[in-house]
Amino acid sequence: SIQGTMAAGLTVCMLFGGMDVSQFSVAGLAGMFLGILYDAGCNDYVTLLLVMLLGVALGAVNAFLICNLKISPMIATMGMQFVLRGFCYIATNGAYVYLKSPVFDFIGNGKVFGAIPFCLIIMAVIYLILWYVMKYTKFGRNVYACGGNHKAAQLAGINVSFMRYKAHMISSLCAAIGGIIMTCQNTASMCNAGEGSDMDCIAAVTLGGLALAGGKGKMVGTLIGI
């Protein structure tokens, strides 16, 4: 469910014609931020909201590097990958923060009706929302148009830069949610969480039939690829 949740957001980014290899570092930092807020006594639900907002903000930073500083998406997100992972170690000195909250325990290890993992339900809801958005909304059509040809989309009146911001923010938001699930499953905030898994989501998305150049692919394909 961790990779599945993150791959859902990455699908939107790659359909746009972008790339994001920083997802697991975003997830790692989200987990560390969750641990820091929990250790500081912050309300559990406020903590979850702030962690997701952090994910959105990091996605905006990625888009800024690409759109405004004209850095290649691969290089920009790879740079963020190393910066964020380094920050995880610096901010905590490599220490773990153990979570003893029933809310976090239920997110990571709880089951609905005694059989269905709650984290699997989170993943399913995200896929349903993004499937609907990509198939039936103007935003979804614009993402496919941009993925097909950025210049043609710009000439058609689509704000390609703004669309890139949205795509990367969705990707990093899903990464942050994946980081929340990963941290809750481990029952601890760990600075090295997700290390070495940076290409897992990209592999799943491409196995699901999404074109690396963008513009072709479906959410269902990614789900199968997982």
PLM region descriptions:
Residues 1-4, 44-54, 120, 193-201:
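Structural signature of hydrophobic alpha-helical transmembrane segments
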Residues 1-43, 64-71, 209-219:
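Single transmembrane alpha-helix segments in multi-pass membrane proteins
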Residues 8-12, 33-37, 60-64, 86, ...:
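Alpha-helical transmembrane segments of multipass membrane proteins
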Residues 30-31, 54, 80-84, 122, ...:
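Transmembrane alpha-helical core residues of multi-pass small-molecule transporters
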Residues 43-51, 57-62, 112-189:
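Helix-loop-helix "hairpin" substructures at the membrane interface of multi-pass membrane proteins
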Residues 69, 73-137, 163-166, 185-194:
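Transmembrane helix-bundle core of multi-pass membrane transporters
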Residues 175, 185-226:
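Transmembrane alpha-helical segments in multi-pass inner-membrane proteins
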